[in-house]
Regions:
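Short loop/turn segments that flank or connect secondary-structure elements
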Residues: 1-195
């Protein structure tokens, strides 16, 4: 583990390779799972504030799910998440050209919304767990992302490089520069770990 500020980072984030391969997976991460996308404090409010711009891109079933359940729900583990359509796919899912992706992000990409998408989606395959005095960042290895691991290996893209924009969005440029410095120190052997 590496610590930067109040963030504890798993070595897998430096060592594992990952690069989404939408042509292969078709955005299945928006469909599969036990609950909706985890939401950080304030994200449900950002969805609500931008909903008028997001809604035109949503499927009718997604709109119905939001109208019935709300912009967010609390899952079985007590976490705030996006609502689901019939307990399966995210209410904010859209399908284009045979791929699933996010109505929230589509509105943002067109300059119509100020909210890009939940940071938990943007940062996947990193999952962040909040503790009293720190955050723990771990690499999540979901079976449906096997193609992303393969593509990441083939292209030599570490998780932290693939997620540069998301990590900067959450933690800032200076934090990301420190992360890259730690990665170089690990790579050159200046930081060693007993394994």
């Amino acid at each position: 583990m590496i610590q930067i500020g109040d963030t504890i980072i798993s070595l897998d984030i430096f060592e594992k390779k990952f690069c989404c391969d939408l042509a292969v997976c078709k955005g299945i991460c928006c469909v599969e799972g036990d609950s909706g996308a985890p939401l950080e404090e304030g994200e449900a409010e950002q969805i609500r504030e931008n909903y008028r711009k997001i809604k035109p891109y949503m499927k009718p079933e997604g709109i119905a799910a939001v109208e019935e359940q709300g912009f967010s729900v609390v899952d079985i583990e007590g976490d705030m998440v996006t609502p689901l359509i019939e307990g399966r796919e995210c209410a904010y899912i859209i399908e284009e050209n045979g791929c699933s992706w996010c109505a929230i992000e589509k509105a943002w990409s067109r300059g119509e919304s100020s909210f890009r998408k939940p940071i938990s989606c943007h940062m996947y395959p990193i999952r962040v767990k909040q503790y009293q005095n720190y955050e723990a960042m771990n690499y999540d290895q979901w079976t449906i992302c096997a193609c992303a691991r393969l593509k990441g290996e083939q292209e030599g893209i570490p998780v932290y490089v693939f997620l540069k924009d998301a990590l900067i969005r959450k933690y800032g440029e200076e934090w990301y520069e420190q992360l890259c410095y730690a990665a170089r120190e690990i790579e050159t052997g200046k930081i060693k770990f007993g394994r």
